[in-house]
Design a protein with these regions (language model features):
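Active-site-proximal cap/loop segments of hydrolase catalytic domains
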Residues: 491, 499-712
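Short loop/turn segments that connect beta-strands within beta-propeller blades
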Residues: 80-83, 116-121, 197-200, 267-271, ...
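Predominantly five- to eight-bladed beta-propeller fold
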Residues: 17-23, 72-73, 152-218, 246-249, ...
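Conserved beta-propeller blade repeats
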Residues: 42-57, 89-105, 132-147, 179-192, ...
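Beta-strand-rich domains and repeat architectures in extracellular enzymes and scaffolds
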Residues: 37-73
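Cap/lid segment of the alpha/beta-hydrolase catalytic domain
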Residues: 251, 413, 421-545, 552
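C-terminal motif of bacterial Sec signal peptides marking the signal peptidase cleavage site
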Residues: 8-10
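Short, solvent-exposed loop/turn segments at conserved positions within beta-propeller repeat blades
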Residues: 67-72, 107, 184-188, 254-261, ...
Length: 712
C-alpha cells in the first residue's frame, strides 16, 4: 500500500497543471510615448472567420504576459449589427471556422473543438475524437460531411530508430539536404488526412471521425508546404467530390533546389489525382473553387527557383481546362484572395508601398480588375463578405491590425472601423507623423521613401536620424506595423527614420523588383545612399553628424555592407540576422533555390560573372574599411541565416578595435518572438543608438561651456 501511495504521489507531482490564460493587460503609460512594455501590452488581432448567413464574425486576439513570458490566443464571436460588433462569446482557442449549420470549429492544444449553442444562451464545446495525432489545421467540406485534418507524419529515421540501444544519444546522422528548415530539424512533414464526419452527432455531445485516408500516404511530401503554409493551400469543390491541394513532390537535395510546387486535384470517390499546373515550373499555391464550381483559381509564379517572382492570379475553367492569367497588367503581386461570388475574386496587392484591395470580375468573357480601397497610408487585407459589405483587416505604421468593414456606394469606398482593440493604449500616447517623399535615384528614377518624425516634433530642432534597411530582400516597405521593427517606437525615442523602397521591392513594377538579384552591392545600395543623402541635404531637422543605419535579414546584410562603404556618413550601425560572409551563407542556408537565384550561382563557378560579382561584394571583404561602432544581433535557431554570421562580424569589429556589441538569443529564430527577449531587444537597440547618436553635454566644471562628450 505504501508503494501504491508513493506511486500516486509521484504521478501527482509530475502532472503539470494547466496555466491560467493570459487576459488583456492593463497598462498606464508615463510620458505619452510608446514604450516596449506598451507594445507587448497590445492585443494582436489575427484570424477572421465570417458567417455570412447569420451576420457573425469570429476572430482571434492574442495577449502577452511579460512576467510569465508567454501568450494566450482567444476566439471572440460577435454579431454584426448596424455597423457595430456586439460580442456574444469568448474562449481560448485558435483557427476559427464556421460550419454549414452555424457552429464554430476551432483548435486548442492539438485538438479540434466545435463550439455549440444550446437552449437559451448556454454553449458547449464538443471535442473531435477518433484521430490520434495532434491536429494543426482543418478544412471542412461544404456540407460538413467530410473533413481534412493536417497532422505531422514522421519522414526521417531517428538515431533511436536506427540504434534502439542508444535511446539517449543526441547525435543526428544526415545523408541528404533539407535536414533543417527555418527553425527546426526536418523530421516530419505536414500531410492531409481525409475523414468522414457526422456533424449531426453534435446533438448527442459526441463527434467522431472515421475512414481516414492520407492523401500523401507512403511519401515524404508536404501539404501544406513548410515553413509557413496552412490550410489556405487546400480547397474543397462545392459538391465535396474533389480536393485541390498544393504539393512540391520533391525531397532532399531536389527539394532544396526547387520552388516547383503544383496544384493537384484529388477525386474523393476514385482516389485518383491529376496535376493541373504541370506546365508551370515555379510556385503554384493556394487553390480555391468558385462557389458554383465552374472555376478554380490559384496563385502562380513562373520561374523555378525564384521565390520572389511575380505572384500571379490564375483561373481555370473546370469544364474546359482553359487557363487565364487574370491579374495580367497589374504589374504587382496578388498576396491573398477569396471568391466573392461565382465570377468575382477579391484580393490585395501592394502598389507604391501600400497594400490595397482589388476586385477581379468577369465581364464579357474578360477578367477585369478594379481597385476597391482608397489611396492612403494604410495596408489592407481582405477577409470576406457579408452581402455587399466587405470585411477586412487594416493597419499602418501608426496602428496595429483592426477589423474594418467597407461598402462601395456610387463608386466611393465607405469605411467603418469595427474593432478598437488597442484604443486604451493609443489614447495615452502621441504617434509620430509619417510622410511620403519621392526621391530621384542615381540612375534618374523615382523612389518612394517614408519619413517618420518624432511625436511633438519641433521644427526648430535637429534630430538624430536613422536609415532603415528592409529585409526580404524582395519585401515592400509598406504601411506595416511591427512589434519589433516599429517605426513609432523609433520616433518615440526622438529619432527621425528614413525608410526607402529601394531597388528590389514589389509594388513599383516587375523591373524595379528584379533589379537586385545578383546585384546585392549595386543599385540597391546606391538607392540607400540617395535616400539618406537627399533627406539630410534638404531637411534642416536631420542631424547630419549623428546618423545611424539599422536593418534585419537582407537589411542586416545591407548594414554590414554599408559599414565598409559609407564614407563616414554614419556614427552607429545595428545588424539583425544579417549575412556577413556570402560564401558561407551560400552553403549554410537551407533553401538553396534562394541562394542560387539571388546570388547568381555558386562561388566555385569561376566563369559565372554574376556569381563572382556577388561574392566579390560580400561584406566580410570590406572589414578593413570598417570604422564605426556596430551592434550585431542574431538568434541561434535561425537556420535561414546562421548565428555564426553575427559572431564573425562581431569578432571582426573587436579585432579591428571598433566598438561592438553582440546580442545572441539561444532560443529565437529569424524573428524574436518571446516577450522578455523582445523587450531585451528593444532596450539593447536603443541603448546602443543613444550611446553613439545622442550627444551628452558634459559637466561645465569639467569642460568648456557647451562642449559635448567627444566619445558620443
Amino acid at each position: 500500500m505504501a508503494g501504491i501511495a508513493l506511486l500516486a504521489a509521484s504521478c501527482a507531482k509530475e502532472a503539470t497543471p494547466e496555466k491560467e490564460p493570459i487576459t488583456k493587460p492593463q497598462i498606464t503609460i508615463e510620458g505619452g510615448r510608446l514604450t516596449p512594455e506598451a507594445l507587448w501590452a497590445m492585443g494582436r488581432i489575427g484570424n477572421v472567420a465570417i458567417d455570412a448567413d447569420n451576420q457573425r464574425i469570429a476572430y482571434t486576439v492574442s495577449y502577452y504576459s511579460v512576467p510569465e513570458n508567454r501568450s494566450t490566443t482567444w476566439v471572440r464571436i460577435c454579431d454584426l449589427k448596424n455597423g457595430q460588433l456586439e460580442q456574444t462569446d469568448e474562449f481560448v482557442g485558435s483557427d476559427p471556422a464556421w460550419t454549414q449549420n452555424g457552429q464554430l470549429a476551432y483548435l486548442k492544444g492539438g485538438k479540434l473543438y466545435f463550439h455549440v449553442k444550446r437552449a437559451g444562451q448556454r454553449t458547449e464545446d464538443i471535442v473531435l475524437t477518433g484521430f490520434d495525432k495532434d491536429i494543426e489545421g482543418f478544412l471542412l467540406s461544404p456540407d460538413n460531411s467530410q473533413i481534412l485534418l493536417m497532422a505531422e507524419v514522421k519522414t526521417v529515421e531517428s538515431t533511436a530508430d536506427r540504434y534502439p540501444d542508444l535511446d539517449k544519444a543526441t547525435g543526428r546522422v544526415v545523408d541528404d539536404l533539407m535536414y533543417k528548415h527555418w527553425d527546426e530539424w526536418t523530421e516530419t512533414a505536414p500531410q492531409p488526412f481525409l475523414a468522414q464526419l457526422d456533424e449531426n452527432n453534435i446533438e448527442n455531445k459526441q463527434l467522431q471521425v472515421s475512414n481516414f485516408v492520407n492523401l500523401l500516404e507512403g511519401t515524404q511530401y508536404e501539404s501544406p508546404m513548410k515553413p509557413f503554409g496552412g490550410v489556405e493551400q487546400w480547397a474543397w469543390s462545392p459538391d465535396g467530390t474533389e480536393i485541390a491541394y498544393t504539393c512540391r513532390t520533391k525531397i532532399g537535395l531536389e527539394y532544396a533546389l526547387s520552388t516547383n510546387s503544383d496544384i493537384y486535384i484529388y477525386d474523393v470517390r476514385t482516389r485518383m489525382r491529376k496535376n493541373i499546373t504541370q506546365d508551370n515550373l515555379g510556385y503554384d499555391t493556394n487553390p480555391s473553387y468558385s462557389p458554383n464550381g465552374q472555376y478554380i483559381a490559384w496563385q502562380s509564379m513562373e520561374r523555378d527557383g525564384y521565390e520572389s517572382d511575380e505572384n500571379r492570379l490564375f483561373i481555370m475553367n473546370t469544364a474546359t481546362g482553359e487557363k487565364v492569367f487574370a491579374s495580367r497588367g497589374l504589374d504587382t503581386n496578388v498576396d491573398s484572395y477569396y471568391w466573392k461570388d461565382d465570377s468575382t475574386i477579391v484580393f490585395n496587392g501592394v502598389w507604391h508601398a501600400t497594400e490595397r484591395i482589388y476586385q477581379c470580375s468577369l465581364h464579357n468573357g474578360e477578367w477585369e480588375i478594379a481597385q476597391l480601397t482608397p489611396d492612403g497610408q494604410y495596408d489592407y487585407e481582405p477577409c470576406g463578405n457579408i452581402g455587399n459589405t466587405y470585411i477586412c483587416l487594416r493597419h499602418s505604421m501608426r496602428e496595429a491590425n483592426e477589423i474594418y468593414q467597407f461598402r462601395i456606394e456610387n463608386g466611393q469606398c465607405e469605411l467603418n472601423q469595427l474593432t478598437f482593440e488597442n484604443k486604451n493604449i493609443y489614447d495615452q500616447i502621441e504617434m509620430g507623423r509619417v510622410e511620403p517623399r519621392w526621391q530621384t535615384t542615381t540612375d534618374g528614377k523615382q523612389m518612394l521613401t517614408w519619413i517618420i518624425y518624432p511625436p511633438h516634433f519641433d521644427p526648430n530642432k535637429k534630430y538624430p536620424t536613422l536609415l532603415y534597411c528592409e529585409g526580404g530582400p524582395q519585401s515592400p516597405v509598406s504601411q506595416f506595423w511591427s512589434f519589433r521593427w516599429n517605426f513609432m517606437m523609433m520616433s518615440a525615442n526622438d529619432y527621425i527614420v528614413v525608410a526607402p523602397n529601394r531597388r528590389g521591392l514589389p509594388g513599383f513594377g516587375k523591373e524595379w523588383n528584379e533589379e537586385i538579384s545578383g546585384d546585392y552591392g549595386g543599385q540597391c545600395m546606391r538607392d540607400y545612399f540617395t535616400a539618406i543623402d537627399e533627406f539630410v541635404a534638404h531637411s534642416p531637422n536631420a542631424d547630419k553628424d549623428h546618423l545611424g543605419c539599422v536593418g534585419a535579414s537582407f537589411g542586416g546584410f545591407s548594414v554590414y555592407w554599408i559599414a565598409g562603404h559609407h564614407d563616414h556618413r554614419f556614427k552607429a550601425f545595428i545588424a539583425h540576422d544579417g549575412i556577413f560572409n556570402m560564401e558561407m551563407q551560400y552553403l549554410e542556408t537551407e533553401e538553396k533555390w534562394f541562394a542560387n537565384w539571388d546570388m547568381g550561382g555558386a562561388y566555385w563557378e569561376k566563369d559565372n560573372a554574376v556569381a563572382q560579382c556577388t561574392f566579390a561584394n560580400s561584406p566580410h571583404r570590406f572589414v578593413d574599411k570598417w570604422d564605426t561602432p556596430i551592434l550585431c544581433i542574431h538568434g541561434e535557431k535561425d537556420y535561414r541565416i546562421l548565428a555564426n554570421q553575427a559572431m564573425a562580424a562581431f569578432d571582426a569589429a573587436k579585432m579591428r578595435g571598433i566598438p561592438a556589441e553582440l546580442l545572441i538569443f539561444p532560443d529565437e529564430n529569424h524573428w524574436v518572438l518571446q516577450p522578455q527577449n523582445g523587450i531585451l531587444w528593444q532596450r539593447t537597440f536603443f541603448s546602443w543608438l543613444d550611446r553613439w547618436l545622442k550627444p551628452v553635454v558634459l559637466d561645465p566644471r569639467e569642460t568648456k561651456c557647451g562642449e559635448t562628450d567627444p566619445n558620443r
